[in-house]
Curated annotation (Swiss-Prot):
Single GO term (MF): tryptophan synthase activity
Keywords for this protein: Amino-acid biosynthesis, Aromatic amino acid biosynthesis, Lyase, Pyridoxal phosphate, Tryptophan biosynthesis
Identification of the protein by name: Tryptophan synthase beta chain
PROSITE patterns found in the cross-reference section: TRP_SYNTHASE_BETA
Record family assignment: Belongs to the TrpB family.
Keyword Lyase found: yes
Listed InterPro entries: Trp_synth_b_CS, Trp_synth_beta, Trp_synth_beta/beta-like, TrpB-like_PALP, TrpB-like_PALP_sf
Cellular component annotations (GO), alphabetically ordered: cytoplasm
Length: 397
């Protein structure tokens, strides 16, 4: 692996643990990415799509009501306002442009909440690429509005009936397809995880989130935030937010994993703090595994956080103490979901609700503390309203 152009590791985490047949494919992808990053024409086309199709920059919104009676200022980075409804659209546009540059004629992707699938479908429709999306059968059921959106935009959605019928199984099927069709096909991985160079590519195609946030907060407040908070599943929205703040040592970075029904129940999706290091999905990173190394089922009310591993850069930031990683239960996330809707008129995705819940916890712990917090509101909650209605009111799913 010494002949890669970019460092494939973050400390001990990362790497390229894939079938031999895919090694040259990943190296070709890395080469194309490095060239594209240095090509002003590629960068201009990407920037144009982000601005005039996706709707960047997204707003930075001050919460006027949630912090009443406290000395906290809480801002939300509004990735929910991006075309497609979540941060996923950013890097999807970048990767499809890259795939076209490489002469690929077909896109495949995996999706959990369906947001990455929707982003892939809309970008493929606009950039005229055929698209197949693998999705766990369980997720197809709980995210039916997104399945309909994908099919409406011309994507072929394949429900995966294997294993736990969730995101990890969709990832495995997508990998299988790619191994068989890599000459014509680009695997558009949806998070900052997987084999090198994906964690680096996804970070670079998401880092405008943090770059914009930094500019906007300086403009609004004249200083950097004390704390930046983002939800962590695979970790793309969080690394996109954190990347531009990593060198700002006075800014605390907090990643929020899903505690599900409670860490002690085993039904959670918090491998970073409660898993062990192993090899999964083409990388070395913390994973939820039993003593025999078998991957355990992750669980979260939020389909997009229901993943048994985490991106290698998050593992590294945790190890060196640059970022803190905490967890929030389903119940806490549901409460935050309702609070934001009720008090600010914004319905957040259940993924983003985990980050918001931790921010509200921080505020509650110390209402007299003068602090400036930014939460990455990574997506909107339209896709989750039936799930939440069912839990709160026994409504139809």
């Amino acid at each position: 692996m010494s002949d890669t152009l970019l460092n494939p590791y973050f400390g001990e985490f990362g790497g390229m643990y894939v079938p031999e047949i895919l090694v040259p494919v990943l190296k070709q992808l890395e080469q194309a990415f490095v060239e594209a990053q240095n090509d002003p024409t590629f960068q201009a086309e990407f920037a144009d799509l982000l601005k005039n199709y996706a709707g960047r920059p997204t707003a930075l919104t001050l919460c006027r009501n949630l912090t009443k009676g406290t000395k906290t200022k809480l801002y939300l980075k509004r990735e929910d306002l991006l075309h497609g409804g979540a941060h996923k659209t950013n890097q999807v546009l970048g990767q499809i442009l890259l795939a076209k540059r490489m002469g690929k004629t077909r896109i495949i992707a995996e999706t959990g909440a369906g947001q990455h699938g929707v982003a892939t479908a809309l970008a493929c429709a606009m950039l005229d690429m055929p698209c197949r999306v693998y999705m766990g059968a369980k997720d197809v059921e709980r995210q039916s509005p997104n399945v309909f959106r994908m099919r409406l935009m011309g994507a072929e959605v394949i429900p995966v009936q294997k294993g736990s019928c969730s995101l990890k199984d969709a990832c495995c099927e997508a990998m299988r397809d790619w191994s068989a069709n890599y000459e014509t096909t680009h695997y558009l991985l949806g998070t900052a995880a997987g084999p090198h160079p994906f964690p680096t590519i996804v970070r670079e195609f998401q880092k405008m989130i943090g770059e914009e946030t930094k500019r906007q907060i300086l403009e609004r407040e004249g200083r950097l935030p004390d704390t930046v908070i983002a939800a962590v599943g695979g970790g793309s929205n969080a690394i996109g937010m954190f990347a531009d703040f990593i060198d700002e040592s006075n800014v605390r970075l907090i990643g929020v994993e899903p505690a599900g029904k409670g860490i002690e129940t085993g039904e959670h999706g918090a491998p970073l703090k409660h898993g062990t290091t192993g090899i999964y999905f083409g990388m070395k990173s913390p994973i939820m595994q039993d003593k025999d190394g078998q991957i355990e089922e992750s669980y979260s009310i939020s389909a997009g956080l229901d993943f048994p591993s985490v991106g290698p850069q998050h593992a590294y930031l945790n190890e060196i103490g640059r970022a803190d990683y905490v967890s929030i239960t389903d119940e806490e996330a549901l409460n935050a979901f309702q609070e934001l809707a009720k008090h600010e008129g914004i319905i957040p995705a259940l993924e983003s609700s985990h980050a918001l819940a931790y921010a509200l916890k921080l505020i509650k712990q110390n209402p007299e503390k003068e602090q400036l917090l930014v939460v990455n509101l990574s997506g909107r909650g339209d896709k989750d309203i039936f799930t939440v209605d069912k839990i709160l009111n026994g409504g139809a799913n």
